[in-house]
UniProtKB/Swiss-Prot annotation:
Expressed by mycelium-forming spores. It comes from the Eukaryota. Metal ions are not required for the saccharide-binding activity. The keyword Transcription does not apply. It is found in: Secreted. Homohexamer. This is Alpha-(1-6)-linked fucose-specific lectin. One of its GO terms (molecular function) is carbohydrate binding. Keywords: Lectin, Secreted. Thermostable. Still fully active after heating to 70 degrees Celsius for 10 minutes. Its main location: secreted. Alpha-(1-6)-linked L-fucose specific lectin.
């Protein structure tokens, strides 16, 4: 199950946190 309009998956190597870059553009 993938979120809608996932452009890319941003992974932070420091926190190992992956956030999907959605259309929302939260910038989180």
């Amino acid at each position: 199950i993938d979120p809608v309009n996932v452009k890319k998956l941003q992974c932070d190597g420091d926190t190992y946190k992956c956030t999907a870059d959605l259309d929302f553009g939260d910038g989180r």
